[in-house]
Swiss-Prot record:
This protein's record includes keyword DNA damage: yes
Organism of derivation: Vaccinia virus (strain Copenhagen)
Family designation: Belongs to the RuvC family. Poxviruses-type subfamily.
Keyword Ubl conjugation: no
Co-factor requirement: Mg(2+)
Functional note: Plays a role in DNA replication by cleaving viral DNA concatamers to yield unit-length viral genomes. The concatamer junctions contain inverted repeat sequences that can be extruded as cruciforms, yielding Holliday junctions that A22 protein cleaves.
Record InterPro entries: HJ-resolvase_A22, RNaseH-like_sf
The enzyme's E.C. designation: 3.1.-.-
Gene Ontology BP annotations: DNA recombination; DNA repair
Enzyme category, top tier: hydrolase
Protein name: Resolvase OPG149
Length: 176
């Protein structure tokens, strides 16, 4: 006999988005169910040492249906994280792993990061979670992971969100 909690709810989708990096990787986990979005987790991670074990632990915390990874330049030292995640989930999960371009585009790195944090804080107001956002100067990594996940959800719903408009929608997904 199984309990209702042990049965997988197939009407919901668990979306995980990673902003890749060794020092400041970040993860956002959203549950999309019946046209609503619930924030399950927004975390700064640390993959600076023993990264294989730490990534495996971070990947094993939820049953994802979709994992979004921020695309990295071909010669980036962080490409190893993408291949490790794809390999780890290949036989152990039904999750779809997708490499996507960053949400924000623009002339300067600083401008992109500023707009990403502003959009993130606006979403935190919308979800009623602004008070739980720590007062930190380094929010751009969690903001980037959150914006990756929200752009994916909004694109699935064919919903336009002005801060994400500078990205050519639907062209951001690329097989790696």
């Amino acid at each position: 006999m199984s309990s209702p909690m042990s049965k997988k709810d197939y009407s919901s989708e668990i979306i995980c988005a990673f902003d890749i990096g060794a020092k400041n990787p970040a993860r956002t986990v959203l549950e999309v169910k019946d046209n609503s979005v619930r924030v399950l987790d927004i975390s700064k991670l640390d993959w600076s040492s023993d990264w294989e074990r730490r990534i495996a632990k971070d990947l094993s915390q939820y049953e994802y249906t979709t994992v979004l990874l921020e695309r990295q330049p071909r010669r980036s030292p962080y490409v190893k994280f993408i291949y490790f995640i794809k390999g780890f989930l290949y036989h152990t999960s039904a999750a779809k792993v997708i490499c996507v371009s960053p949400v924000m585009s623009g002339n300067s790195y600083r401008d992109r990061k500023k707009r990403s944090v502003e959009a993130f804080l606006d979403w935190m107001d919308t979800f009623g979670l602004r008070d739980s956002v720590p007062d930190r100067r380094k929010l751009d990594d969690v903001a980037d992971s959150f914006n990756l996940a929200m752009r994916y959800v909004l694109d699935k719903w064919n919903t336009n969100y002005t801060p994400y408009n500078r990205c050519k929608s639907r062209n951001y997904i690329k097989k790696m």
